[in-house]
Amino acid sequence: RTGILTEEEMQKVTEATAIIYDLPLFINTKTRNIQDIEIYARKLKNKENIGLLIIDYIQLLKSQNKLNSREQEVSEITRTLKLLSLELKIPIIGLCQLNRNAARTRPILSDLRESGAIEQDADNVIFIYKKEENEDQKVIEDVIIDLQKQRAGPTTQVTVRFDKRINEFINLVRR
């Protein structure tokens, strides 16, 4: 909270920075339409053999095609991402916004904003949310990682601790 790191914390930051620096990460903050993302992903697959594509977040994307509604546009985007994943043989993680009413309760698949196609096209859907809504500004709190859709297996939930100071999920020890 103070912005001052201990010597141990600074050492961890330095070590993490070195690890990240050596990773083959490619960050594109300019591409906003799905057609350009397809081109960019194919180039990266051919040139760098990428093994994962992450979209932050799906509802920010646009299509160059003229469609009748935003729902149709998001459907085209998710379908394109699904086909791209199959073509490039890599997982694609698409972060999504939820409808506003989902913020107060346990989210469900129909809370995915702007399209039912997101839940239909996704192989897996995972929600992360607070176990209890409270007014306390806790630094560490329990959160639920909720796998609500898994095309190849069962759904499940797990409770973990989340440390806001360092954005870290911590497994709870089972006794």
Cite the ranges covered by each PLM segment:
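C-terminal regions of RecA-like/P-loop NTPase motor modules
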Residues: E8, Q35-I50, R79-L88, R100-R175
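Walker A/P-loop NTP-binding active-site region of P-loop NTPases
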Residues: R1, Q59-K62, D121-D123, L147
